[in-house]
């Protein structure tokens, strides 16, 4: 099974052909628009967002799913899906608390809060995936705040989740050789902030898209995991 996460930087409908060439089974897309069901004739599309042109979507090519009844639209943007094979998927597009505040009172956008909220649900299955644009790295950690990525990763590890990239490449968080974000599309402004965390599933390989192949489409490159 191939899992791909990618922040497409808007207009998925114009970029879908490119990402679809990678033949995903599960495609997690951030910053994408709401699309009609018939746009994906051979797949199922699940989406949530505040505006129709900017949200988080999941395209399933060989599975169906149901949005879990615990779904909380005040958590921006996190989509909990129960796949028909028993796997749980939390599609993720995380924001800082300050950025999430723009969505309105009571809205929370940080992944640390989403993990707290969905913890019982995630622990209800032996197999689970948390994947997407986390907008975070240990390089920005200060003090001992819950929102620090080091603390977030510690919570995930306590729940049995492992980052595919770090497991397969034997690299420490914050020292990643491969970037997933090229800020302002500059080749030298690199960050690793997109992740695939797995529990009860064994990754066979991981690939990070190249700057040259993807920079015309987005400031992010795809993260591609085979399990």
Residue map of PLM features:
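Active-site-proximal loop/helix segment associated with metal-binding centers of metalloenzymes
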Residues: 89-109, 146, 154
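Active-site metal-binding loops of divalent metal-dependent hydrolases
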Residues: 8, 32, 94, 133-134, ...
């Amino acid at each position: 099974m191939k899992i791909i996460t990618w922040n497409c930087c808007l207009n998925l409908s114009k970029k879908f052909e490119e990402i679809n060439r990678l033949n995903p089974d599960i495609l997690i897309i951030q910053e994408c628009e709401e699309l009609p069901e018939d746009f994906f004739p051979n797949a199922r599309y699940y989406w949530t967002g505040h505006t129709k042109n900017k949200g988080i979507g999941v395209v399933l090519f060989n599975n169906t799913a149901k949005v879990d009844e615990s779904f909380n639209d005040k958590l921006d943007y996190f989509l909990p899906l129960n796949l028909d094979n028993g796997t749980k998927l939390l599609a993720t597009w995380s924001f800082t608390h300050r950025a999430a505040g723009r969505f309105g009172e009571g809205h929370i956008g940080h992944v640390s809060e989403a993990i707290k909220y969905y913890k019982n649900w995630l622990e209800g299955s032996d197999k689970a995936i948390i994947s997407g644009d986390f907008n975070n790295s240990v390089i920005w950690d200060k003090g001992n705040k819950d929102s620090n990525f080091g603390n977030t990763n510690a919570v995930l590890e306590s729940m049995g989740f492992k980052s595919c990239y770090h497991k397969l490449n034997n690299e420490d968080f914050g020292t990643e050789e491969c970037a997933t974000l090229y800020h302002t599309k500059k080749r030298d402004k690199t960050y690793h902030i997109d992740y695939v965390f797995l529990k009860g599933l064994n990754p066979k390989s991981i690939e990070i898209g190249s700057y040259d192949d993807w920079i015309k489409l987005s400031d992010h490159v795809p993260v591609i995991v085979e399990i």
